[in-house]
Structure formats: structure tokens, C-alpha cells
């Protein structure tokens, strides 16, 4: 072991310090002149420089192709949703401006087929480039034709029907002036736009050059002009050269009916092609071979031609012709000859229905009647629009239906309302009185913002107008769980006609100021109440109640209540005995009783309470009198005039016979039935004469007026005393 070896000493590492954080001044050189210039700059100037930097970044974003693509996709999504607002048109103009101003940094998209287009990274040129001042020179119909024809050229390029700058597709603008649209000679199909098309006449002279400086292929237009001159029904002509079409045109058998596409073409015409058409004899021969009804013409060893009454129909026939030629070429290559093929019978072939049925589950009415090729062409236009071509094609029937939000209170909330609660000059506070005044306005605003249970569907074009019309249809289905609807004045499942009639009736009542007690109670309707008339009850018979039929059973009472209700049984018995005594007694007895009555004062303690003031009907339970007179004499009588003085009671006049009988009572111990509260005084002849009419009216109340034949009229008059109110008036006159 070495002597230098020593014991190892374990030492701990020094404590680690916190890492140094980089600060702003560590990254800035204080001696840098740029830093010194920025530090010494005024704050306003420094802010202006910062704003310039921000604007520079915004300009870079606006000029970037990625931003343009994003903006274009957003606009396309808004177009699919429909209901284009005003702001969407502004976005479209911005997108068009950005598309035209931004340079195409990516390589151009390879043309010649749909697969090549899907692999491309470049931006396509829009078909509908008629913007601003370019669209003023054309009417609406020509704009649509230009967009359709330019989109047709793009479709021909995507399907591979183009042959460099050759082949032509033309359309007739109008029949009056015989103007036609054709592609400029030297322009590829992928470059054709609506504004670049050239307008020519029937001789091939240029009428409108469009947006290019290119001319027209006169030799190529000769074929089209010959067909247009011979067929006034032709609106569009397509002339293309495809390999399969050229192969079929070279076959002696021609186009064989071996596929449905071949049978859908109808009668196929053939023409022996001898080169470029330059003379008139060739035109006449083409017109003769085409005939008046053929839609398809095959040029021998050259190409294919289709004629249509519209752009869509011409596309339909040329597409089926190309497909039929490809099927025939491939079939003959595999079959070994036309003798080995099975041919279809054109007489048994049934054409496809052009009008599809109504989609299931929809109640929006019948779909538009499609013409030949319209449905297929519209589907392809939709494809081009989805790819960003912006064809400008007017769609007749939308493919995607907007799914309605079922059971939602607000489908599309109102963006603008015509009612405002506060003006610009208001302070923001609202008084309670003004708040109450605005209640009706708030209810109307809430109703305007509420949704409706209908769905809006777009109707397609019809023969009279190319515009689409909005049609409201009822929403299918019903809510399973609903809450109480506030202010529901019209109940559900109510006939609208009845509601309108009731509303008009209420308005008429308000105009005529007719106020009633309201509707009749449904609970007590039809319940009849039979009330038995109690004797002595006063029944009111109101004319208004009877006329309004609120009380059908009304008893009209012509007499008053019973005056004997206040008398006791003892008093009634005494009255009955006195009446019998009067009937049996003689005149002498009556005179004696009268004299005794005058001598002896009446007993004031036996005076009963005064009878009621109203003339009443006697009770039916009074004892029957032994005479043969009718009970109606004692039960009914006409009421006497009441006393006009408030101090004296009027009952004394109502019952004079009762008072007289009480004075004629022979028994002094027996209390009379009725007595006058004032002391009796001798009647005067004048008073008797004045009182005679009143007593004659009350004579039916006298029990002995009819029964005793021995009584003379003079003694009847002596029985009655002078009424109290006449005595009082006489005293006043004497004084």
C-alpha cells in the first residue's frame, strides 16, 4: 500500500443559485442608434408607426391566397343556405376583387379532365364574370345564356370532349335578330367565361367582341349557321371530336341500338363529310340529311353533332351520344363483330320518366316539370359551383332541403323591428306611467319576434316567370308536451269563421253602444225554479226583465198585501160577529147603536195598531158569510188615494166601514175592532158631500152594501164618517 494514500474526504457541491432571467434591457443594446432614435421619438409618432405596421400585416393577409379561399368558401356556404342578405353581396364583391387582384402564385391547374382538376392546387377562373359595367350592355336573358354556354364549355373540358382550341358550342340569342354566341377562336375551353363569348350574326360577322381581342373561326361556324338556317327550333348546337365518336362514325353499321343511351337518341342522321364546309352546296346537303326532327347528326369519319331546343337538351343528347359510342366501341372489341351482338327493339323501348314523384314526407306541392336534360344539367352546375366556378346558373329546384327546426318558438328571429322603446335623446330612465303606456307596444313587439308554425319552401320557376316564389306550408306533426300559452284569446281547434263572426258581432255592439250583462252562466243554464206564491207576498213584474227573458215565469199582482195581517184572532172574530150582526139587525137597531156610540166615548186602550197604508187583498181563510154573495166582493177592492199630509195616517180613509162598525157595537165592554185616534166630531153636510166619491169607491169593502136589500142609499151615506184629512183641511180653511 502506498504511503501517500490518505482517507477520502467527501465534500458537498456548492449551493446552486437561481438561474438568471433574461430581461428586456439584456436584449437591447443601449448604444444602438435605432434604439436611441425610437426612445427619443415622440409618443404620437411612435403610435403612428405602430399603426402602419399593423396595416402592413392586414394588407399581407388580404393579399394571401389562403385568405381568399377561406372567404370564398364562406360565401359559398351562405349561398347554399339561401336567403341572401345585403351583407353577403358585399362579401361577394370583396371576394371578386381579391380574386382579380391577387396574383396566382401557384402553378395553373392542368386541364383536360376531371381527375386532373381534382389534383390541381390552383384557383379556377369564375364563369360568371359579368360584374359592374360589363353587365350593363346585356339584358337578363343574354346574361343567363352567356353563363350557361360558358359553363357548358367548362363541362366539355372536364369530360374530355375538348380538342385544343377546336370544336365549337353555339347558342341562339334571339330569333328576331338572328344573333349567336360562340367561343373566340384561340381560347381554351378552360378559359371561357361569360364575358369572353363573341356575338355574331348568321353570316359570321362579329356583333359584340366580348372581353377579348380574338376573332371567330368562320369555317367552324359554317356548319352551325347551316343548321340554324334550316331548323328554327334549334337553340343550341354542339360539335365535338372524341375518339369513340370518330370510331363509330367510321363504321358502316353506324350507331347500333345496343344500349339505352343509343335508343334515347331517336332517329340518328348521317352525313358524308368531305372536309371543311366552304360552299353553299355542302350546307344544303347537311340540311337535307339532318331532316326536320333529328336531334343527332354523325359526320362520317369526323365527329358528332347534337341539336337541342335549349342548352340543357343539347347537352343531354351529346352526352348520351358519346356514352353510346364508347359502349359500342368496347362491345365490338370484345364481341368480335356486330353479328354477335344482341340488338334492342326501339318499338318496345320505354323512355325514362322526366317528371319524378314528390319526395316522401313532403307536403310542399308538386315538383317542377323538368324538360329534357334540365335535371342532369342542373346537377352538374351544382357540382361546378361547389368547386368554386361560380356559374351563375338559376336553379329551379334546390337539391338540399333546409331542415326546419321543429317545435321551436322562434324559427328566424326578427333582425329589424319597426318599434322602438327609447329615442336617442332619452336619458335611459323610464317613469312608471310611461312604462304602463308602453305595455301594448311591448306585447306587439314580442308577437312580431315570435315564430310561426309554418315552413317556408321555395317554389321553382314556371313558364311565366323565372323567379322562385316563397310558399308557406303548414308544419307537420304536433307538440307532445306544451306549456300554457299566455294571452290565448282564441282556443285551439276553433273554427276561424266562428271567431270572425263573434269578433264582428262584438265590434257592432261597441259601435252601437249596446251593453249587456254578459254571457249566460253555463252552470245554471236550463235550470227552472218554480216558486210558489205565498199569500201576501209582493211580486214585482218588471217589463225589462220580462222582455230580456231572464225571468220567464212572472206573476203580475194588481192588488196590495192583506190588511188583516196585523190583527189578532180575537179581533178578527169580533169583526166577523159584527158583520153578521149588521146583516141580521134592523134599521132601528142601527140607529140605537149609533146614538149609544155618540154618547159613550171609545176606549183608547183597545185601539190596535194602524193597518198598512197600501190597499191589500183580504185573506182567503176568513169565515164564509151566510149570505149568497160572492167572495170576490170582500177579497178585492180598488185602492183609495193615499193621504197627502205626512202627519196624519192614511189608514182612516182606507177602512171607514170598520170604524163605523166599531162605534155601532152594543156591548160597551167589548173593544171595537178599529177606532179613530182622534175624537169623533159631528159630520157636516158639506163634508159628507165631499167624501161621497171616496166612499163610493171603497163601497165594495162594506159588508152590507150588497147583502141587505132593506137599506136605502141615504142611510148608506150616513154610515160613513168624514175622512180625517178632509177635517183637517176644513179646520185650516176656517182659521
From Swiss-Prot:
<feature type="modified residue" description="Phosphoserine">
    <location>
        <position position="586"/>
    </location>
</feature>
<feature type="modified residue" description="Phosphothreonine">
    <location>
        <position position="331"/>
    </location>
</feature>
<dbReference type="GO" id="GO:0048873">
    <property type="term" value="P:homeostasis of number of cells within a tissue"/>
</dbReference>
<keyword id="KW-0597">Phosphoprotein</keyword>
<feature type="modified residue" description="Phosphoserine">
    <location>
        <position position="355"/>
    </location>
</feature>
<dbReference type="GO" id="GO:1903142">
    <property type="term" value="P:positive regulation of establishment of endothelial barrier"/>
</dbReference>
<feature type="modified residue" description="Phosphothreonine">
    <location>
        <position position="610"/>
    </location>
</feature>
<feature type="compositionally biased region" description="Basic and acidic residues">
    <location>
        <begin position="576"/>
        <end position="601"/>
    </location>
</feature>
<feature type="modified residue" description="Phosphoserine">
    <location>
        <position position="605"/>
    </location>
</feature>
<dbReference type="GO" id="GO:0016020">
    <property type="term" value="C:membrane"/>
</dbReference>
<keyword id="KW-0963">Cytoplasm</keyword>
<feature type="modified residue" description="Phosphoserine">
    <location>
        <position position="465"/>
    </location>
</feature>
<feature type="modified residue" description="Phosphoserine">
    <location>
        <position position="708"/>
    </location>
</feature>
<feature type="modified residue" description="Phosphoserine">
    <location>
        <position position="408"/>
    </location>
</feature>
<feature type="modified residue" description="Phosphoserine">
    <location>
        <position position="712"/>
    </location>
</feature>
<keyword id="KW-0112">Calmodulin-binding</keyword>
<feature type="modified residue" description="Phosphothreonine">
    <location>
        <position position="614"/>
    </location>
</feature>
<feature type="modified residue" description="Phosphoserine">
    <location>
        <position position="431"/>
    </location>
</feature>
<comment type="similarity">
    <text>Belongs to the aldolase class II family. Adducin subfamily.</text>
</comment>
<feature type="modified residue" description="Phosphoserine">
    <location>
        <position position="59"/>
    </location>
</feature>
<dbReference type="GO" id="GO:0005912">
    <property type="term" value="C:adherens junction"/>
</dbReference>
<dbReference type="InterPro" id="IPR001303">
    <property type="entry name" value="Aldolase_II/adducin_N"/>
</dbReference>
<protein>
    <recommendedName>
        <fullName>Alpha-adducin</fullName>
    </recommendedName>
</protein>
<feature type="compositionally biased region" description="Basic residues">
    <location>
        <begin position="713"/>
        <end position="735"/>
    </location>
</feature>
<feature type="modified residue" description="Phosphoserine">
    <location>
        <position position="353"/>
    </location>
</feature>
<dbReference type="GO" id="GO:0035264">
    <property type="term" value="P:multicellular organism growth"/>
</dbReference>
<feature type="modified residue" description="Phosphoserine">
    <location>
        <position position="12"/>
    </location>
</feature>
<feature type="modified residue" description="Phosphoserine">
    <location>
        <position position="427"/>
    </location>
</feature>
<comment type="subunit">
    <text>Heterodimer of an alpha and a beta subunit or an alpha and a gamma subunit.</text>
</comment>
<dbReference type="GO" id="GO:0045202">
    <property type="term" value="C:synapse"/>
</dbReference>
<keyword id="KW-0007">Acetylation</keyword>
<dbReference type="GO" id="GO:1903393">
    <property type="term" value="P:positive regulation of adherens junction organization"/>
</dbReference>
<feature type="region of interest" description="Disordered">
    <location>
        <begin position="1"/>
        <end position="21"/>
    </location>
</feature>
<feature type="modified residue" description="Phosphoserine; by PKA and PKC">
    <location>
        <position position="724"/>
    </location>
</feature>
<dbReference type="GO" id="GO:0005200">
    <property type="term" value="F:structural constituent of cytoskeleton"/>
</dbReference>
<dbReference type="GO" id="GO:0005886">
    <property type="term" value="C:plasma membrane"/>
</dbReference>
<dbReference type="GO" id="GO:0071277">
    <property type="term" value="P:cellular response to calcium ion"/>
</dbReference>
<feature type="region of interest" description="Interaction with calmodulin">
    <location>
        <begin position="715"/>
        <end position="732"/>
    </location>
</feature>
<dbReference type="GO" id="GO:0016604">
    <property type="term" value="C:nuclear body"/>
</dbReference>
<feature type="compositionally biased region" description="Low complexity">
    <location>
        <begin position="698"/>
        <end position="712"/>
    </location>
</feature>
<feature type="modified residue" description="Phosphoserine">
    <location>
        <position position="366"/>
    </location>
</feature>
<feature type="modified residue" description="Phosphoserine; by PKC">
    <location>
        <position position="714"/>
    </location>
</feature>
Amino acid at each position: 500500500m502506498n504511503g501517500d494514500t490518505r482517507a477520502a474526504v467527501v465534500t458537498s457541491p456548492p449551493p446552486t443559485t437561481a438561474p438568471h432571467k433574461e430581461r428586456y434591457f439584456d436584449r437591447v443594446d443601449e448604444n444602438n442608434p435605432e434604439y436611441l432614435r425610437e426612445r427619443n421619438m415622440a409618443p404620437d409618432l411612435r403610435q403612428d408607426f405602430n399603426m402602419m405596421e399593423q396595416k402592413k400585416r392586414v394588407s399581407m393577409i388580404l393579399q394571401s391566397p389562403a385568405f381568399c379561399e377561406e372567404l370564398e368558401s364562406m360565401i359559398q356556404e351562405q349561398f347554399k343556405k339561401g336567403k341572401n342578405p345585403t351583407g353577403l353581396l358585399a362579401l361577394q364583391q370583396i371576394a371578386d376583387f381579391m380574386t382579380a387582384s391577387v396574383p396566382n402564385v401557384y402553378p395553373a391547374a392542368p386541364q383536360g379532365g376531371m381527375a386532373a382538376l381534382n389534383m390541381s392546387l390552383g384557383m379556377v377562373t369564375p364563369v360568371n364574370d359579368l360584374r359592374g359595367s360589363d353587365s350593363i350592355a346585356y339584358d337578363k336573358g343574354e346574361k343567363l345564356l352567356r353563363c350557361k354556354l360558358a359553363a357548358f364549355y367548362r363541362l366539355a373540358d372536364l369530360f374530355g370532349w375538348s380538342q385544343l382550341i377546336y370544336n365549337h358550342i353555339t347558342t341562339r340569342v334571339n330569333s328576331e335578330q338572328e344573333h349567336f354566341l360562340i367561343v373566340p377562336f384561340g381560347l381554351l375551353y378552360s378559359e371561357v367565361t361569360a364575358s369572353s363569348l363573341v356575338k355574331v350574326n348568321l353570316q359570321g360577322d362579329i356583333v359584340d367582341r366580348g372581353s377579348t381581342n380574338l376573332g371567330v373561326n368562320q369555317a367552324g361556324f359554317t356548319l352551325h349557321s347551316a343548321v340554324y338556317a334550316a331548323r328554327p327550333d334549334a337553340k343550341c348546337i354542339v360539335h365535338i371530336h372524341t375518339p369513340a365518336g370518330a370510331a363509330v362514325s367510321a363504321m358502316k353499321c353506324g350507331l347500333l341500338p345496343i344500349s339505352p343511351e343509343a335508343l334515347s337518341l331517336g332517329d340518328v342522321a348521317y352525313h358524308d363529310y368531305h372536309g371543311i364546309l366552304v360552299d353553299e352546296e355542302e350546307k344544303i346537303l347537311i340540311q337535307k340529311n339532318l331532316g326536320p326532327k333529328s336531334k343527332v347528326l354523325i359526320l362520317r369519319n369526323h365527329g358528332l353533332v347534337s341539336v337541342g331546343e335549349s342548352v340543357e337538351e343539347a347537352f343531354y343528347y351529346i352526352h348520351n351520344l358519346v356514352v353510346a359510342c364508347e359502349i359500342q366501341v368496347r362491345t365490338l372489341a370484345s364481341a368480335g363483330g356486330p353479328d354477335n351482338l344482341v340488338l334492342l327493339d326501339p318499338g318496345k323501348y320505354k323512355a325514362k320518366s322526366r317528371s319524378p314523384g314528390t319526395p316522401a314526407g313532403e307536403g310542399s306541392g308538386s315538383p317542377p316539370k323538368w324538360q329534357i336534360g334540365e335535371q342532369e344539367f342542373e346537377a352538374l352546375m351544382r357540382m361546378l359551383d361547389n368547386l368554386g366556378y361560380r356559374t351563375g346558373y338559376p336553379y329551379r329546384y334546390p337539391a338540399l332541403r333546409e331542415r326546419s327546426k321543429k317545435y321551436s318558438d322562434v324559427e328566424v328571429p326578427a333582425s329589424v323591428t319597426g318599434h322602438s322603446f327609447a329615442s336617442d335623446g332619452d336619458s335611459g330612465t323610464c317613469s312608471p306611467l310611461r312604462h304602463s303606456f308602453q305595455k301594448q307596444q311591448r306585447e306587439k313587439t314580442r308577437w312580431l319576434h315570435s315564430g310561426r308554425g309554418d315552413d317556408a319552401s321555395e317554389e321553382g320557376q314556371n313558364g311565366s316567370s323565372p323567379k322562385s316564389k316563397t310558399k308557406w306550408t303548414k308544419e307537420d306533426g304536433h307538440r307532445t308536451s306544451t306549456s300554457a300559452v299566455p294571452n290565448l284569446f282564441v282556443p285551439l281547434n276553433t273554427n276561424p269563421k266562428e271567431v270572425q263572426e263573434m269578433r264582428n258581432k262584438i265590434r257592432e255592439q261597441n259601435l252601437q253602444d249596446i251593453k249587456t250583462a254578459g254571457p249566460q252562466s253555463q252552470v245554471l243554464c236550463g235550470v227552472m225554479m218554480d216558486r210558489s206564491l205565498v199569500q201576501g207576498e209582493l211580486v214585482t213584474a218588471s217589463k225589462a226583465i220580462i222582455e230580456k227573458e231572464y225571468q220567464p215565469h212572472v206573476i203580475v199582482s194588481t192588488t196590495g198585501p192583506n190588511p188583516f195581517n196585523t190583527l189578532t184572532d180575537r179581533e178578527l172574530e169580533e169583526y166577523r160577529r159584527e158583520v153578521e150582526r149588521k146583516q141580521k139587525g134592523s134599521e132601528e137597531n142601527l140607529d140605537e147603536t149609533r146614538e149609544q156610540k155618540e154618547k159613550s166615548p171609545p176606549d183608547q186602550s183597545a185601539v190596535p195598531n194602524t193597518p198598512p197604508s197600501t190597499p191589500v187583498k183580504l185573506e182567503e181563510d176568513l169565515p164564509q158569510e151566510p149570505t149568497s154573495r160572492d167572495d170576490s166582493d170582500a177579497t178585492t177592492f180598488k185602492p183609495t188615494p193615499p193621504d197627502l199630509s205626512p202627519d196624519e195616517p192614511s189608514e182612516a180613509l182606507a177602512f171607514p166601514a170598520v170604524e163605523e162598525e166599531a162605534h155601532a157595537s152594543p156591548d160597551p165592554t167589548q173593544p171595537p175592532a178599529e177606532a179613530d185616534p182622534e175624537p169623533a166630531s159631528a159630520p157636516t153636510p158639506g163634508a159628507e158631500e165631499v167624501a161621497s166619491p171616496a166612499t163610493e169607491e171603497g163601497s165594495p169593502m162594506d159588508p152590507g152594501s150588497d147583502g141587505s136589500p132593506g137599506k136605502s142609499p141615504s142611510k148608506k151615506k150616513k154610515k160613513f164618517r168624514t175622512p180625517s184629512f178632509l177635517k183637517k183641511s176644513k179646520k185650516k180653511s176656517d182659521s
